[in-house]
Amino acid sequence: MEYDYRADYTYDASGMGRLHRKGAPETICLSTPGTDTPRYKINVENAIPFAVAPELKVDGKWLSGADRDAVHKIQKHSAGKESATAEISCTWQDKHQVVTDYQLDKNGMKITVSGKGEVGLMIPAFTFDGKEKTVISNSGRTLTIRYRGWECRWELQQGKISDTGKTGYNRNGHYRIFRAENNDTLTAVIRIERQK
């Protein structure tokens, strides 16, 4: 797991930009965040900056932790032999804030976003590497990306997952941007496993 809290937007975006599992394709969850102003070009228009990032709905508009004006601060973190945790605040316009708790262990990554009102979590779903396409399914509570014999599964404990209709890209390929959302608190668990 890697979290960028001061992104260089010519290259990437702030938020969790990397989650790998040994043996799985690096890109199945996310290997590097994406920017809306890359130095490289791929045939995707109107791309947005993306990462696994908290979001907050204010006055009918979603504020994203991947946006340039979001300020991320590490509140606490720890890492052991078999687990790691981090608590990170994300603030917009010095007044709107969410706190995100990340817990990583052998069972996957648990992410909890807490704030006032509608909170969200940006989910970049890998779609195309230039040669192969992934298979994506969304039940509203579980989003699954299948690729090269593996699957990345995002499961919500409450709320819903929906397609934002937005896209992004990085040096690894194309992404469809989904959002998990709920009131006040949202918990998602990410698991990367071999397909059954």
Language-model region placement:
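Beta-strand-rich recognition/accessory modules
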Residues: E118, M122-T127, S139-G140, R146-K196
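Hydrophobic alpha-helical positions that pack around
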Residues: T134-I136
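Generic recognition of long tandem-repeat/solenoid scaffolds
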Residues: L19, A84-T91, I111, L143-R146, ...
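Intrinsic disorder/low-complexity signal
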Residues: Y3, A7, Y11, P25, ...
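Catalytic and substrate-binding regions of extracellular carbohydrate-active enzymes
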Residues: M1-G120
